């Protein structure tokens, strides 16, 4: 097992990880251990059929199975904040990893679009506040339409995923 793990949480996190796996240049990113965690069983089943390790997150749970993190020295957590799965479990996983001795925990998260509503933005803000002691790279989805006005949403998300990868490969986070 690689000493670097990329933990994808929720739909947005899983999408980011799939893009990163496809376009990564750095050897360590390609060779990292990937774990896809979500509450969407259908999505996990699809990922499992592709040969990826998956973890079913029970929405009513307040814990993360840290046995999955044994031997990990650097943990990147990818998640979209705003929804239940990403906002809740990115925080739980990060805090569990820190308390279980993972030396370097970094989160790369997206913030919701304004049109998704104030509830999702409030969830995202609350999650960010509780992560104040952990390095976080924030990618704001609202900026996608400004930065890439000629791209459709799918392509704009891929650009955002590549920004996450660039931050990882550059060692800035």
Language model features with spans:
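Tubulin/FtsZ superfamily GTPase core signature
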Residues: 1-173
């Amino acid at each position: 097992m690689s000493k670097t793990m990329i933990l994808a949480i929720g739909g947005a996190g899983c999408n980011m990880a799939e893009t990163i796996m496809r376009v990564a240049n750095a050897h360590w990113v390609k060779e990292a251990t990937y774990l896809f965690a979500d509450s969407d069983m259908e999505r996990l089943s699809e990922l499992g059929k592709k040969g990826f390790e998956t973890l079913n997150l029970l929405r009513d749970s307040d814990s993360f199975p840290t046995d999955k993190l044994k031997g990990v020295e650097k943990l990147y957590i990818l998640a979209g904040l705003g929804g239940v799965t990403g906002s809740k479990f990115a925080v739980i996983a990060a805090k569990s990893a820190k308390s279980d001795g993972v030396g370097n925990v970094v989160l790369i998260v997206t913030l919701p679009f304004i049109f998704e509503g104030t509830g999702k933005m409030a969830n995202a803000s609350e999650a960010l506040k509780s992560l104040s002691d952990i390095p976080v790279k924030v990618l704001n989805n609202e900026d996608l339409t400004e930065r890439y006005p000629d791209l459709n949403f799918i392509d704009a998300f891929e650009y955002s995923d590549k920004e996450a990868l660039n931050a990882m490969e550059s060692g800035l986070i």
